[in-house]
């Protein structure tokens, strides 16, 4: 019986879409309440003053102001526009 053997399937050749993680607003940039500052997996950065954290570890602004990063404690803060910390 002259049958053609079926082609085997390929097990590789897939990839997931990128998740677009990272810093969205950098130090010194102005933000309004609700703006996403960082998208991350886990707590690479921690929320500081004027900042909240979502259940997927997204860091977002709670107040209008200016973003600044504290590298020592790896914290992200938002200083309200009229405060001294913003300068």
Swiss-Prot record:
- Going by the entry's taxonomy, the superkingdom of the source organism is recorded as Bacteria
**What GO molecular functions are on record for this protein?**
structural constituent of ribosome
Q: Where are the transmembrane segments?
A: none
Listed name of the protein? Large ribosomal subunit protein bL27
Identify the species of origin.
Answer: Akkermansia muciniphila (strain ATCC BAA-835 / DSM 22959 / JCM 33894 / BCRC 81048 / CCUG 64013 / CIP 107961 / Muc)
Give the matching PANTHER family.
LARGE RIBOSOMAL SUBUNIT PROTEIN BL27M, RIBOSOMAL PROTEIN L27
GO BP, one annotated term: translation
Q: Which gene is this protein's source?
A: rpmA
Entry-linked Gene3D superfamilies = 2.40.50.100
List GO terms (cellular component aspect).
cytosolic large ribosomal subunit
Provide this UniProt record's keywords sorted from A to Z.
Ribonucleoprotein, Ribosomal protein
The region called Disordered is annotated at 1-22
Checking PROSITE patterns in the record gives: RIBOSOMAL_L27
Homology family: Belongs to the bacterial ribosomal protein bL27 family.
């Amino acid at each position: 019986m002259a049958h053609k053997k079926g082609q085997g399937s390929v097990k590789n050749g897939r990839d997931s879409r990128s998740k677009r993680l990272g810093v969205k607003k950098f130090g010194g940039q102005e933000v309004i309440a609700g703006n996403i500052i960082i998208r991350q997996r886990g707590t690479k950065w921690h929320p500081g003053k004027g900042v909240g954290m979502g259940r997927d570890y997204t860091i977002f602004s709670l107040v209008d102001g200016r973003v600044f990063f504290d590298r020592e404690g790896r914290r992200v803060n938002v200083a309200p526009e009229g405060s001294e910390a913003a300068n």
